[in-house]
Amino acid sequence: MQKEQLSAYMDGEQVETDLIDALLRDEELQASWHSFHTVRSVMRKESAVFLGADFTAKMADLIELEDVKKVDVIAVSQPEPEDAHNSVFMQKLKAFFAPMTQVAVAAGVCLVAVLGVQSFNNKNDASNLPETPVLQTLPFNNAVQEVSYNAPSKDTLTSDQLEKKSRRIGAMLQNYELQRRMHSDALDVSSSQVR
């Protein structure tokens, strides 16, 4: 509880005077006070030194006090690296992967050759062509379509446009009938001559 009050006192909060009196008398609270200030200065990057001057001496003492366990060395012959290379398994493994390695190297060389030629050709073609846009921003019909409820629609026909359209269709039908009659008359004449 005293450490919480000590932390609050460091943050600038009001604490009881009993805590201040205890801080002046108790060495453990003074050590906590010191460690809290050290932590605060390190967190605020106010101090680069956060280890005490006697840190190395403490570590040396702790290392000396540590129990040393002795392990009996069991003499087991370990294979030498030369033996591992000469084992039957390694020889079979090398024999299995050697052709695959050769094929992989050949495929890599071919890939580099093809990509190199293509990139070389693309650079030459790109220099001869006019600049084309990377991103086509207009629709295929090259017209911007308005998107609004009140926008006039280009698809609805007026009465004048409908009348012109029906006249055009009528003229096309008359032309078709005339050509059909002329063609049928020409067929009748040629068929009568053949008889």
UniProtKB/Swiss-Prot annotation:
Q: Which InterPro entries match?
A: Anti-sigma-E_RseA-like (IPR052383), Anti-sigma_E_RseA_C (IPR005573), Anti-sigma_E_RseA_N (IPR005572), Anti-sigma_E_RseA_N_sf (IPR036147), RseA (IPR026279)
Report the Pfam families cross-referenced here: RseA_C, RseA_N
Could you tell me one molecular function GO term of this UniProt entry? Answer: sigma factor antagonist activity
Which parts of the chain span the membrane according to its record?
95-117
User: What is known about its processing and modification?
Assistant: Sequentially cleaved by DegS (a site-1 protease) in its periplasmic domain between Val-147 and Ser-148, then by RseP (a site-2 protease). The N-terminal fragment is then degraded by primarily ClpX-ClpP in an ATP-dependent fashion. Sequential cleavage by DegS, RseP and ClpX-ClpP frees RpoE from RseA.
**What Gene3D superfamilies would the database entry show?**
1.20.5.3960, Anti sigma-E protein RseA, N-terminal domain
Membrane topology, record value:
Single-pass type II membrane protein
Q: Pinpoint the site Cleavage.
A: S148, Y149
Q: What is its main location?
A: membrane
What keywords are annotated for this sequence in UniProt?
Answer: Cell inner membrane, Cell membrane, Coiled coil, Membrane, Signal-anchor, Transcription, Transcription regulation, Transmembrane, Transmembrane helix
Q: How does it assemble?
A: Interacts 1:1 with ECF RNA polymerase sigma-E (RpoE); this inhibits the interaction of sigma-E with the RNA polymerase catalytic core and leads to a decreased expression of sigma-E-regulated genes. Interacts with RseB with 1:1 stoichiometry. The liberated N-terminus forms a complex with SspB and RpoE.
Entry domain remark: The N-terminal cytosolic domain interacts with sigma-E. After degradation by RseP binds to SspB, targeting RseA for degradation by the ClpX-ClpP protease. The C-terminal periplasmic domain interacts with RseB and is also the target for DegS.
What's the family? Belongs to the RseA family.
Protein purpose: An anti-sigma factor for extracytoplasmic function (ECF) sigma factor sigma-E (RpoE). ECF sigma factors are held in an inactive form by an anti-sigma factor until released by regulated intramembrane proteolysis (RIP). RIP occurs when an extracytoplasmic signal triggers a concerted proteolytic cascade to transmit information and elicit cellular responses.
Name of this protein: Anti-sigma-E factor RseA
